[in-house]
């Protein structure tokens, strides 16, 4: 191979090693003595060690290594057969990357190796070092680079030991470890195949204290290594130990563990190797010493295998005898190749191998057939192994030459095929060292010896090389034993041929050694370690003596070793004594017993499982391949068939296209006719329904006007019938017309099975689709028609009777005719009549005819001509035609036939009757009385039957009605009893609460504080007011009763309520006691305060009527009502009661709460800790006010990032519950979001006082902030809110429960009572009576203090509220009407009455209507538009890169380009262009412009005289030179010249205006008629006055009409630059640029610039020399100019909205009067539009909405307050309505109002609050006649509700408040529907509600709806469970807690892992903390509805 170092080597000869050119060839020796002949089975030449140029020096160093000490020498021979020094130490192959470390088995830690080979970095991993990189040919080629070694050829040459310690041929590795090395990651403890290095220094050798086993094994080294496994063991020049893993002798075969085991030594070896690998433990040489000599085997096994082992041993000896040189053969070869000199082989110092062979070699028998070709790394020390291991890995049987097997293969059958797959690591291992050829293997072949051994030619017994060396292995192993007879081959299992490894037999000479070792080392069978030798089989007992002579081996030419001079080298031989010693040692080794083979059952089972798995894999691969082949074949055939199918389809289409087209057209025509008929039917039904409804209304009117009850019932029945008819007609209209299904597909699913086609066919059967009592398509005959027919028959009969009178009523036959006629269509089912077996009337003869007709109808589609056409397409079309006929036409024809038949039959019957009467007329005279009697009897019987049936039916109906009434009454009674019980329970709960409130109210005197006022008018009104009735209950002084918590013990069914009253009293007392106890014990641990007197706050009962003065710490003066509020708050604190300060907004709730904290710090020395929780927008406001009012307080602003808050938490003092003045902080201010985020830290603190600002944020008891704050350890809580009630009573309950959890959470019924919303409570009664109002107000009074501005603040004027109504514009009306047309009135009524859960669709309609009312541009914005530009523009990657001044060049070009070749454009293509290639360029100019030109001066001069051609020039004022120049100038130049030429003739008309000079014209200008009559000079001198207007009438009219300022009505669809000629020539580009960018032409068109004109004036250039003015006229459109880009008009933007137009007028007036405006919006998009409007009007403004950051909010508010030039403040209603002081504004405008009046009240109180000195005016813009009017009406209703509940007074209507406008929460659709409906529709909704309520259907429907909603809500879960009306109404609007600030969420500092808080990412009120806990850490952004709901506290986060 070219990448290996080459040396002078002898090429290998054919058949020199006995392989006949097949298999691995032996190592060819280089120049030097001829090597001895190899063994008959072929020498294993080492192809792994090429000789490099630098190998000589290292080889000499290795040879000159000092001999080891005796301890080492005693163990060195142990590795004779396995340890071989490197041939020149070329490359050291290492096992793993851990090659620089050695591992001690006793202490498996890495130790640095003291010896490292210089080339060790080129090592290859061990698992692949022994694998041949190439095929056999490559192996043969590689042989030239290898030296023949004794071990490599299985010769007797003794190799030196490895440098890391002794190796033993008795310590082979397990195949499982080998398998692991080959197929898994490299083991760091496995040695690599590398040349053995020189012996290490003595410090690395084994200590002499460890003795070998039986004197044969070397002592274990100090740094033992892992046992190295190998399958078979053989010697190679690169092998250092027999314990080295052979690791895949060839890539052509699988590892040994792959092959099937057999009951042989090979099977046991394989199982041992596999089992040892599973253990995974380190090898312990001490344990191996005892386990190595164990086990026994029957002697018959030894007898059976003796012959073959003898043969193997003889072969070994003969091969070794031919190589008796002590390792000098390969060494000499290497050195010779390196030095290129002939050298004397005997002048060298003995090598380490020679040294080892001369010391105690009689004690180290060697089995050369078990050597490995893999060398251990230089830094590994292999532990001494037992000799039994060598026998457990038997030598391979020499394969016959005819097999051609590889010597190093371990496969049972050795083939020469290339490897099926090579591991990438193997390839990398092969190529790791390009100079190393040691990648082959020298393992003995383990193939089965299926061929008889007789084919092997015996070797010669006389070998001259025996005398070469006495101590050589050739003399030791060679003997004269004859070759044993061949062993019978075992039968091969055809399934397991490739899986069974070969057996290897052992010699019998090891029996003595086994006994000897048993004496020295007893066996330890219970050793827990997993040992390779433990599981091996014992040596067979019977063996043939080793001294027997074998048959002569076949003659093989063995190359003789040669000396330096070329003469043959004499071989050394062993003495007889040494040979006898060696033979005895080998006998002792072979007689050693092996473990029993039964111990390998588990390994056998595992091997079989792997074999089965491999077989399954192969089968699956074959199956996949077969499937792939089938699929490919199918695809090919399908392509072929597809061609034929396509051809057939095309041919069929060509043949049948015309017929199919005609059929389709006819079908479409028929369908159109049917559609028209359906529409006619629909219109008739609608008209009939309208008529019926009118009849119903008339009947109802008559019923209401009727006086008699019977008459009223009659009219009511008529109305009911009409109503039923209307309902039926409506149902028909909704479900469609029942008939042929023309509009439904044929394969639409049918719920009853089958398809729609079969379903329709069943429905379309004749006889089943006919209506009840219908004979045909004609309408049923009325009674009058029938009576007329009867009268006609009677008249005919009378005429026949010749005047004889017939009886007055002859009904017998008439009745029979009637029955026959009406019953005939019903008796189509003959089978039914047969089953009933009833007597048939004379109508029976008609039945057979009907049957015949039906049979014909069924058989009609069967046409015999159909059988002639068998094509599929024809049959499909044919079947479709007949199917359509059967579906549509057959039924119609059948009905026509039936009608015709019935008419004919009726006529025939009548004729027959008349005929019979005429025939029997003579009998009538005698039988007339009898027949009359019979007829009357039949009629009477029929009437009686009808009467009794009707009577029975009425009785049955009455009975059912009575039963139903009884059930209804029972249900009502049960409901009444339950209601009474619930009422008593509710009364008990309310009484308990009332008692508690009464006791507290007496102490804290809330009523007195509320009534206090400083307004004189209010004081007078209070005096005149009648005091309310209050509870007069004495406080019990006796012992407190037991608290009742189990309500099941109370009897709520009893009438006596004394027990309940007593229990309520006890519960109220216990609640008070618990509150007081909690207040006492809060600071009990460290409270050392004054415990005497009235000021002891820990004794709440001792507080008297003490007036508290204003604290001195407070740097402001409190007003009187604020001081009373302070007293009330202190009183609450003393009693341990929490409260709600609900003063109206703007009355100073903040300063009152600050004064409480100052009072506690001043009086009781309680400086904290105080906690203030406020919305994010008011945090800075709180901090500023606390610092301003109480500077002594240390305020800790707790917000910022997670890291900032972590630092702030260091100031917390959790050890003390009461802070002193020197505490780190006194008041902490934070937001609701951070409280939830860092709830774990807040709950660890004990807070003296917690103040919640804008407490409506916790109005939802389901929100996480409510739950978190409720769990804080606080002595007192104070809620600040200006609107305690916002939507319903459930929110109020949430606040009350928060301040008193022990009372208001006493039972679930109390919560349910509040949550049911008192507005809709009281047994479906919508009136809340006075008693309930008073009791509710009594509950609220003690805990809530509320004052309004008009009572307490006389200097604050009232606010004036005005509703400004606006009209819809034309565009708004069109859009509003379009939306209204999309609303179904019926759906609206149904959703409003039934409470459907689908509120999103209705609210979406509400949002659309609101957008229309606000501005139409909210739907579709009129943006800047331009036509489609059909061109290309240049682009730039970044304008920033272009700089501040960007040069925009003309880069536009059309997408259409006219490309011309350069040949046409430049190279002579254009004939008039001169050039090198154009020889005719000047012809046109020469002849046409010069010679043939008639305009030359010479020709003109000659043609001037007389009447010649140019005689007219004398009258045109033109010279012949001017005419010549004009003919040679282009059109543009002539136009410019004419524009600069002065018209003197027109001025003559102005100068000479006398009559005689009127028509004067100079003679030389007689032809200048236009110039003479030009009026332009006259118009130019008369620019002003009436004359100027008359002279410039077009210009003045155009300017006055404003056409130039109008917007363009039409715009072009597209625009494109001119098409350019493209040519690959620079001249073409220059020419095009000269045309497009002609500077003189542009100068003439556009005139001089302003700078040039200025320069002309400054330079005083005379006007005559001025450049010509701009010839390009001014554009007609002043704004649009010459461009087609249209910009929307702001004027239209204002006028498109009625609100904006009205606001425009209002703002102009306010601006003139000096007002400042707060403008509130519900939609942020409307704020965006308003910004554009304000910019258009040049109004200064600022903006604040939910997206504004916290610091920006603060700065924006400060700017508006301090800068008067800012006219308008744009705010979002919900974002700008909390905690902002905007008193500098005196006008509030609501662009659109909120449906919740509380939101608007908060917004307007931003200006109407303390500090306001002006009159506040509030304007509401309401669009008339739209949804906004109804929303405003609903808001006023809610405002009344709140006023009544808070004040407790009566409403203006008296007798209670009408809450009919508010339904239950689950029917919020009614509110939305009432907004959408107009007055008439609202009336219909209420009427429908009343009807359902009276009938009882409303409750059923609502219950059903609630059940479905519960399931839906249960499935939804989480925060989507309850979506309030607020959330849907305010969709898209921001608010304060909507993010947009820089407060980051908690990160690593938050223990819950909650990140977020008040994050600025817009994630809502509570960052991502709880959201992450809910959703598992998802960072998905919340929707707008979720953020708004979180901000309001509606839903949990």
UniProtKB/Swiss-Prot annotation:
Location relative to the cell: Nucleus
Superkingdom per UniProt: Eukaryota
PROSITE patterns in the record: DBINO, HELICASE_ATP_BIND_1, HELICASE_CTER
Composition bias, Basic and acidic residues: 12-25, 108-117, 264-276, 298-317, 500-519, 529-540, 709-723, 782-793, 824-858, 1891-1902, 1919-1933
GO cellular component: Ino80 complex
Biased composition, class Pro residues, residue ranges: 32-41
Keywords of the record: Activator, ATP-binding, Coiled coil, DNA damage, DNA repair, DNA-binding, Hydrolase, Nucleotide-binding, Nucleus, Transcription, Transcription regulation
Sequence motif DEAQ box, residues: 1253-1256
All residue ranges annotated as the DBINO domain in the record: 881-1006
Domain-level remarks: The DBINO region is involved in binding to DNA.
Protein name per UniProt: Chromatin-remodeling ATPase INO80
Lineage, broadest ranks: Eukaryota, Fungi, Dikarya, Ascomycota, Pezizomycotina
Gene label: crf2-1
